[in-house]
Amino acid sequence: MPRLLGVEIPAKKKVAYSLRYINGIGPTRADLLVKEAGLSPDMRAQDLTEEQLNKILHLITEHKWVLEGDLRREIAGNLKRLQAINCYRGVRHRRGLPVRGQRTSTNARTRKGPRKTVGVSKAAAAAKA
C-alpha cells in the first residue's frame, strides 16, 4: 500500500479513488492531481512508481491545500471558537442538536442519539395507587 502524507492509500483501487482517502482531497481535487501528474485515469495505486508518488506529493504541496491533521485541527478550532463566543451555532453544537435549522420536535435522531424514554417505574406507580 502506498503512503502519502502519512495515509496508506488502498493499492487495488484506481489512483483518483485512492487519493480520496486523504482527508481534504475529494473527487475534484483527486481528478485534478491525476491530470496534472500526467497519469492514466485507469491506473491503479499499486502500479505507481516512487517517482510518480513524489510527483503527486509535490503537486499537493504546490497547491498549498490544508489536508489531514491540519484540516482536522482547523475544523475543531472553528467549532471551539463558535462555542466560546456563545453564538447560536456554537450553543447548538455544544448541546448536540441540529445546527442548520432542522426541526427537533420529531426527528433529529442522528444528532440527538437514541431516544431516552421518560416514564414511571412499576414500583413508583403502585405506591401512588
UniProtKB/Swiss-Prot annotation:
Entries under InterPro entries matching the protein: Rbsml_uS13_C, Ribosomal_uS13, Ribosomal_uS13-like_H2TH, Ribosomal_uS13_bac-type, Ribosomal_uS13_CS
Output the Gene Ontology cellular-component terms: cytosol; small ribosomal subunit
Per the record's keyword annotation, is tRNA-binding included, yes or no? yes
Q: Which GO BP annotation is one of this protein's?
A: translation
- Disordered: where is this region? 96-129
Q: Which PROSITE patterns match?
A: RIBOSOMAL_S13_1, RIBOSOMAL_S13_2
Keywords, A to Z?
Ribonucleoprotein, Ribosomal protein, RNA-binding, rRNA-binding, tRNA-binding
**What stretch or stretches form a coiled coil here?**
none
Q: A GO molecular function for this record? A: tRNA binding
Known partners and oligomeric status: Part of the 30S ribosomal subunit. Forms a loose heterodimer with protein S19. Forms two bridges to the 50S subunit in the 70S ribosome.
PANTHER family associated with the record: 30S RIBOSOMAL PROTEIN S13/40S RIBOSOMAL PROTEIN S18 (PTHR10871), SMALL RIBOSOMAL SUBUNIT PROTEIN US13M (PTHR10871:SF1)
Query: Which family does the UniProt entry place this protein in?
Result: Belongs to the universal ribosomal protein uS13 family.
State what this protein does.
Located at the top of the head of the 30S subunit, it contacts several helices of the 16S rRNA. In the 70S ribosome it contacts the 23S rRNA (bridge B1a) and protein L5 of the 50S subunit (bridge B1b), connecting the 2 subunits; these bridges are implicated in subunit movement. Contacts the tRNAs in the A and P-sites.
Name assigned to this protein = Small ribosomal subunit protein uS13
